[in-house]
C-alpha cells in the first residue's frame, strides 16, 4: 500500500543567502514563506523556504545557503527540480531568463512536454515544464503574471548509474508506477500522475557519484507527502519490512515531521507529514518570510545564531497584501499550541544545549 500522495518539498544547498533570495523571488517568481535555520549540526545556516501563492506542500522549495563548503554534483542526486508552468508560457520563460542573464538550455521536449532548463547562481538546475492540467495558484510579481507563473512542482529528475534497484524502490516502497521511457529517461508517477506526482530517473552509467554532505550547488533531498503522522509511522514500518533498515527516526522539523532513507541509487528521500498549522503556524499568513523564526528548542540561542548569519533583505513585494491569489487562511493558534504540547518527547530533534561553533558569516 502507498501512503505517498505526491511531493511535499525539495531541499537544495545554495551559495549566498541574499543571492538565493533574489533568484527565487525575482527570477523564479516564488513567494518567500519562511526564514529559519538548519536544525542539525553545530553550524548556524539559514533554512529558507519559497512557495506558490498558498504555501502548499508540493510547491515548497527550501534551501540551505552553504557558502562554507562546495558540493560535488554527480549521480546519486536530484539533478534537476521541475516546476509546472501554464501551457504556452515556455517562450515567456525563455525571454524572462534572458532578461536576467540566467543560463539556460533553450526550449526542449521530453515525454511530449515542452520545457526549459535553467541554472541557479550556485549551479543548481531547474526545469520549467508546460502543464495544462495544473490548477494550483502561482505567485504573481511585477513581471510574472498568473498566466505565466510557476504553479508548483512537476517533480524531480534523479541521476542514477543503474536504474533497476532504484526503480524497485520507487515502485515497492513508495507506490509509484512506471509510465514511460524517453531515451535515457525513465518516468514514474504516483496515483493519477501529472503535476506534483512525477519522478524521472536519468540513467547516467558513467557519471561519477556526487557528494552526499551539505555543499553549495547540490541537491540535499526530495521530500514526499504522506499526509499524516500515522501514515508517516506506517511508511517507516514499510521501509523496515522491505529491508530498508537504515531509515531515520521520526524527526520534528517544526513545520512538518519526517523520516529519511537513501534509495539504492543514492538519492536521499524524505517522507513528510505537515504539522498542525503548516507553514503559517508561527507567523501572520500575510507576512510570511519577513522574520527569522526559530524552533522552541533554539530560542535560547537566538542572539548567538543571529550573529553567525549573513544579513539579508526580503523584498517588499513578498507581502501578501494586494495579492488576491494569496488565500492562505489564519491559523488556529490554540490548535498549534496543543499539537506542540502533544509532540513533546514524541519526535527527535537536536538538544538545545549544544553549542554552535560557527556559521556562514564566520
Which stretches of residues belong to each language-model region?
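Short amphipathic beta-strand starts and helix->beta connectors
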Residues: 62-68, 139-142, 203-208
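Conserved active-site tyrosine of GNAT-family acetyltransferases
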Residues: 20-25, 48, 97, 123, ...
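Vicinal oxygen chelate
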Residues: 1, 6-15, 34-36, 59, 66-151, 180-201, ...
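Extended intrinsically disordered, low-complexity coil regions enriched in Ser, Thr, Gly, Ala
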Residues: 18-28, 32, 99, 134-137, ...
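Active-site-proximal cofactor/substrate-binding loop regions of enzyme domains
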Residues: 2-74, 87-103
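Surface-exposed interaction/gating patches
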Residues: 147-236, 240-246, 263
Amino acid at each position: 500500500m502507498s501512503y505517498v500522495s505526491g511531493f511535499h518539498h525539495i531541499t537544495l544547498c545554495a551559495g549566498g543567502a541574499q543571492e538565493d533570495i533574489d533568484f527565487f523571488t525575482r527570477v523564479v517568481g516564488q513567494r518567500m514563506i519562511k526564514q529559519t535555520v538548519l536544525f542539525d549540526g553545530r553550524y548556524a545556516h539559514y533554512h529558507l523556504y519559497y512557495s506558490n501563492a498558498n504555501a502548499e506542500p508540493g510547491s515548497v522549495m527550501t534551501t540551505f545557503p552553504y557558502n562554507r563548503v562546495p558540493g560535488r554534483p554527480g549521480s546519486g542526486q536530484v539533478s534537476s527540480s521541475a516546476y509546472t508552468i501554464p501551457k504556452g508560457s515556455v517562450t515567456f520563460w525563455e525571454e524572462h531568463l534572458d532578461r536576467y542573464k540566467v543560463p539556460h538550455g533553450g526550449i526542449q521536449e521530453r515525454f511530449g512536454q515542452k520545457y526549459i532548463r535553467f541554472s541557479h547562481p550556485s549551479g543548481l538546475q531547474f526545469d520549467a515544464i508546460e502543464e495544462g492540467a495544473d490548477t494550483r495558484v502561482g505567485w504573481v510579481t511585477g513581471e510574472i503574471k498568473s498566466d505565466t507563473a510557476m504553479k508548483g512542482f512537476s517533480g524531480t529528475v534523479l541521476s542514477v548509474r543503474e536504474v533497476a534497484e532504484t526503480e524497485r524502490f520507487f515502485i515497492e516502497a513508495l507506490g509509484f508506477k512506471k509510465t514511460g521511457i524517453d531515451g535515457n529517461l525513465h518516468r514514474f508517477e504516483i496515483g493519477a500522475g501529472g503535476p506534483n506526482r512525477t519522478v524521472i530517473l536519468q540513467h547516467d552509467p558513467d557519471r561519477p557519484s556526487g557528494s552526499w554532505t551539505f555543499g553549495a550547488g547540490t541537491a540535499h533531498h526530495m521530500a514526499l507527502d504522506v499526509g499524516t503522522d500515522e501514515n508517516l509511522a506506517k511508511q517507516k514500518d514499510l521501509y523496515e519490512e522491505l529491508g530498508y533498515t537504515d531509515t531515520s527516526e521520526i524527526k520534528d522539523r517544526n513545520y512538518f515531521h519526517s523520516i529519511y532513507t537513501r534509495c539504492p541509487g543514492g538519492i536521499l528521500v524524505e517522507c513528510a507529514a505537515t504539522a498542525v498549522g503548516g507553514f503559517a503556524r508561527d507567523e501572520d499568513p500575510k507576512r510570511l518570510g519577513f522574520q527569522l523564526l526559530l524552533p522552541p528548542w533554539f530560542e535560547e540561542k537566538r542572539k548567538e545564531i543571529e550573529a553567525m548569519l549573513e544579513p539579508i533583505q526580503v523584498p517588499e513585494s513578498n507581502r501578501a497584501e494586494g495579492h488576491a491569489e494569496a488565500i492562505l487562511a489564519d491559523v488556529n493558534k490554540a490548535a498549534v499550541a496543543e499539537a506542540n504540547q502533544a509532540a513533546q518527547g514524541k519526535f527527535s530533534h537536536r538538544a538545545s544545549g549544544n553549542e554552535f561553533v560557527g556559521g556562514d558569516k564566520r
